[in-house]
Amino acid sequence: MKIRIGHGFDVHKFGGEPPLILGGVDVPYEVGLIAHSDGDVALHAISDAILGAMALGDIGKHFPDTDPEFKGADSRVLLRHCYQLATDMGFSLSNLDVTIIAQAPKMAPHIEAIRKVLAADLVADINDINVKATTTEKLGFTGRKEGIAVEAVVLMIKA
């Protein structure tokens, strides 16, 4: 059995028009995130983690923000593409752990919906998907409600 670990990190600044999409879920909030795609910072971090585990670079390499094809792109489509690259190499997801770092909005009401989206898109058991949220106790750019950061770690296995 071959095992690979991938880590992903992404940040987006508040300021775009709603909706705010996190983990494939519309989260009610007064502003969205500024981005070339739909700005789903969670799915971007997860995509990077998968690509990293497979030694395939990052989402900027696969979906450059200079390419008009990806303007406003649905990040769920990008995530599924990244996961397909891994499955084409014979790997599947063992587990995923995601940390959303945001002072606002409150994420607790949305965690289960995000887990369901991720389980569907990654063809995984929901019990292999963990999503949690934390604040920075009002410190830094997330604490000042200037944006959201997300970290993701994946464990990929090849039987």
From Swiss-Prot:
Protein name as it appears in the record: 2-C-methyl-D-erythritol 2,4-cyclodiphosphate synthase
Co-factor binding comment: Binds 1 divalent metal cation per subunit.
Taxonomic lineage from the root: Bacteria, Pseudomonadati, Pseudomonadota, Gammaproteobacteria, Alteromonadales
Entry GO MF terms: 2-C-methyl-D-erythritol 2,4-cyclodiphosphate synthase activity; metal ion binding
Subunit structure as annotated in this protein's UniProt entry: Homotrimer.
Catalytic activity: 4-CDP-2-C-methyl-D-erythritol 2-phosphate = 2-C-methyl-D-erythritol 2,4-cyclic diphosphate + CMP
Enzyme Commission identifier(s): 4.6.1.12
PANTHER family to which the protein is assigned, alphabetical: 2-C-METHYL-D-ERYTHRITOL 2,4-CYCLODIPHOSPHATE SYNTHASE, CHLOROPLASTIC (PTHR43181:SF1)
Cofactor(s) essential for the protein: a divalent metal cation
Disulfide bridge partners, by residue number: none
Keyword vocabulary terms for this entry: Isoprene biosynthesis, Lyase, Metal-binding
Function, in words: Involved in the biosynthesis of isopentenyl diphosphate (IPP) and dimethylallyl diphosphate (DMAPP), two major building blocks of isoprenoid compounds. Catalyzes the conversion of 4-diphosphocytidyl-2-C-methyl-D-erythritol 2-phosphate (CDP-ME2P) to 2-C-methyl-D-erythritol 2,4-cyclodiphosphate (ME-CPP) with a corresponding release of cytidine 5-monophosphate (CMP).
Keyword field contains DNA-binding: no
Record: residues binding a divalent metal cation: D10, H12, H44
Residues involved in 4-CDP-2-C-methyl-D-erythritol 2-phosphate binding: 10-12, 36-37, 58-60, 63-67, 102-108, 134-137, 141, 144
PROSITE patterns associated with the record: ISPF
Stated family: Belongs to the IspF family.
Record site: Transition state stabilizer: H36, T135
GO terms for biological process, alphabetical: isopentenyl diphosphate biosynthetic process, methylerythritol 4-phosphate pathway; terpenoid biosynthetic process
UniProt cross-references to Pfam families, sorted A to Z: YgbB
Pathway noted in the entry: Isoprenoid biosynthesis; isopentenyl diphosphate biosynthesis via DXP pathway; isopentenyl diphosphate from 1-deoxy-D-xylulose 5-phosphate: step 4/6
